């Protein structure tokens, strides 16, 4: 009989940072090591990554990392895992291996070849890893040759799928092998772990609403000049559709992303796309072309930065022309609405025709009927929805009821909560891991906490005020000089002068209150210094709130000389 634990380091009640752990007896399998790109409200934070402490403590039991759909949300933290913990065998598809190796090369990680162990699995070929047999199978997702995994245990199968749609097209790049794996595991599936996708947000099947060929072909056929199309690098389906149209309309084709060029070349090498008669040009030739289809693609944070640079004529390779057309193919994401509007404003300011297809074309994720098909075919005893917000999980549960699934069968753990299944039954004993996710900024890895994120939010909304006070440790006295800086604080010059005058009065009062104490002690002690800085911060914050109704971040510093 099997003892099974499932828990998440990320991906539960959030979209991104997917990292899930499956313990089967003494074997540990990790699915995804992703990252989360926060909205612009979190100033200076490039990405948020999982806490790897548990992995470090249990690394001897870890049999491998499984990557079915190699997108940023699933592989964005691999480099940090390598640096902080070490290397583990990675099991993925041939395409997944290319994406992972490209990321490693991009990040300039000096990893010896004998330490980086990537196993390219063949679909429907069972392999024994640790003490368990695992069968990968192809699913139709946004990246060609994406995998799901079926793990065999003494109590039945555990089926893991990131994203999928039910698709019966003859496109081998997005082949669907659900019909082959279902007979093997149907009625024997103990647990289905699946991404929540569009379940609860889109009734029916996702197909054919994910297809963009007809709309794109019509737009591009009427375009007078070059066509720029922006999409995430996880959307290989759309990039390949654009390449197909370039071939059909005899237009030059270029992908403005060195990393995605590697992926596209791998897709061609694997004979997943026929590039015969496709006129590809280099990135350097974009401005020389008059009618090229230019794909602008990158992970979310980098893509928006790239689009901003192009829109403001700061990009070194691309300049918009009045004859150009721009197609925005990015799905709307909460927190990015302002960015989207600004990018489209920049495009319009350059007198470029634009089309926003982000709301018209569905992402390649399971909708209600896709998920109902999978669940009714597998008949799992338990289901764990992943990679979504809590409301998504509630909607998922309601849709599953329509498929005849009892509410008690749908298990919704949050990050760190351990779900235990012993001898085919849920163990109701509560257990939780304490997690401390990390954020990555320009200085590297940082601890993350509510206070840190609040301060970054303050900086983005109202700016920063720095105050520097100087203390002569030899004479045990404060100098008269006080240095102020207003960074990102929107105030006119008159108000700044008034504020500085009031601030100086407040600060000198704070200093005078402790002068006698420091004279007696003959030095500025650590506790006194901290007390003074906190007191100044509080007083200046109150002053700002009263005079300006703003609440910038106040940073007070005492320098001993």
From Swiss-Prot:
Keywords: Cell membrane, Membrane, Transmembrane, Transmembrane helix
InterPro entries with a match to the protein in the record: RibonucZ/Hydroxyglut_hydro, RNase_J, RNase_J_2, RNase_J_C
A Pfam match: RNase_J_C
A molecular function GO annotation: metal ion binding
Localisation per UniProt entry: Cell membrane
Signal sequence interval, chain numbering: none
Annotated GO CC locations: plasma membrane
Membrane-topology descriptor: Multi-pass membrane protein
Transmembrane annotation, as ranges: 29-49, 80-100
UniProt cross-references to SUPFAM superfamilies, sorted A to Z: Metallo-hydrolase/oxidoreductase (SSF56281)
Protein name according to UniProt: Uncharacterized protein MG423 homolog
Source organism of this protein record: Mycoplasma pneumoniae (strain ATCC 29342 / M129 / Subtype 1)
Upper classification of the organism: Bacteria, Bacillati, Mycoplasmatota, Mycoplasmoidales, Mycoplasmoidaceae
């Amino acid at each position: 009989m099997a003892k099974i634990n499932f828990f998440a380091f990320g991906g539960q009640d959030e979209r991104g940072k997917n990292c899930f752990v499956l313990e089967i007896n003494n074997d540990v399998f990790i699915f995804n090591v992703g990252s989360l790109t926060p909205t612009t409200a979190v100033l200076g934070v490039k990405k948020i990554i999982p806490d790897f402490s548990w992995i470090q403590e249990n690394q001897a039991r870890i049999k491998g990392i499984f990557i079915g759909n190699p997108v940023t949300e699933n592989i964005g933290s691999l480099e940090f895992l390598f640096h902080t913990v070490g290397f583990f065998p990675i099991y993925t598809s041939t395409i997944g291996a290319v994406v992972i190796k490209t990321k490693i090369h991009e990040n300039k990680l000096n990893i010896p070849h004998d330490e980086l162990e990537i196993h390219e699995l063949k679909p429907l070929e069972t392999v024994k890893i640790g003490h368990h047999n695992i069968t990968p199978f192809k699913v139709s997702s946004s990246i060609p040759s994406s995998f799901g995994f079926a793990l065999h245990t003494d109590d039945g199968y555990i089926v893991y799928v990131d994203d999928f749609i039910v698709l019966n097209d003859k496109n081998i790049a997005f082949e669907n092998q659900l019909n082959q794996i279902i007979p093997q595991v149907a009625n024997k599936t103990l647990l289905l772990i699946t991404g929540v996708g569009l379940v609860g947000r889109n009734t029916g099947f996702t197909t054919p609403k994910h297809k963009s060929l007809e709309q794109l072909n019509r737009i591009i056929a009427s375009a007078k000049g070059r066509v720029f199309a922006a999409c995430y690098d996880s959307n290989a389906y759309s990039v390949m559709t654009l390449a197909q149209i370039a071939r059909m309309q005899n237009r030059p084709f270029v992908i403005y992303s060195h990393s995605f060029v590697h992926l596209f070349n791998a897709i061609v090498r694997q004979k997943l796309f026929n590039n015969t008669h496709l006129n590809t040009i280099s990135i350097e030739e974009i401005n020389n072309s008059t009618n090229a289809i230019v794909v602008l693609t990158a992970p979310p944070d980098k893509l928006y930065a790239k689009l901003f640079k192009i829109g403001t004529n700061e990009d070194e390779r691309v300049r918009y022309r009045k004859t150009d057309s721009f197609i925005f193919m990015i799905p709307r994401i909460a927190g990015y609405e302002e960015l989207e509007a600004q990018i489209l404003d920049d495009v319009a300011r350059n007198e470029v025709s634009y089309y926003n297809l982000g709301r018209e074309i569905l992402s390649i994720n399971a909708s209600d009927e896709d998920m109902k098909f999978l669940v009714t075919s597998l008949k799992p005893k338990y289901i764990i929805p992943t990679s979504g917000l809590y409301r998504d999980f509630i909607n998922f549960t309601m849709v599953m009821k329509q498929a005849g699934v009892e509410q008690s069968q749908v298990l919704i753990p949050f990050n760190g909560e351990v779900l235990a299944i012993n001898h085919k039954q849920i163990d109701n004993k509560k257990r939780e891991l304490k997690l401390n996710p990390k954020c990555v900024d320009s200085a590297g890895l940082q601890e993350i906490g509510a206070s840190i994120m609040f301060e970054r939010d303050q900086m983005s909304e109202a700016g920063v005020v720095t105050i520097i006070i100087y203390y002569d440790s030899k004479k045990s006295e404060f100098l008269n000089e006080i240095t102020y800086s207003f960074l990102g604080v929107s105030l006119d010059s008159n108000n700044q002068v008034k504020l500085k005058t009031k601030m100086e009065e407040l600060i000198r009062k704070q200093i005078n209150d402790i002068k006698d104490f420091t004279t007696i002690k003959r030095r500025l002690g650590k506790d006194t210094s901290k007390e003074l800085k906190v007191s100044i911060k509080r007083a200046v914050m109150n002053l700002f709130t009263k005079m300006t109704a703003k609440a910038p971040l106040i940073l007070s510093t005492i320098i001993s000389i």
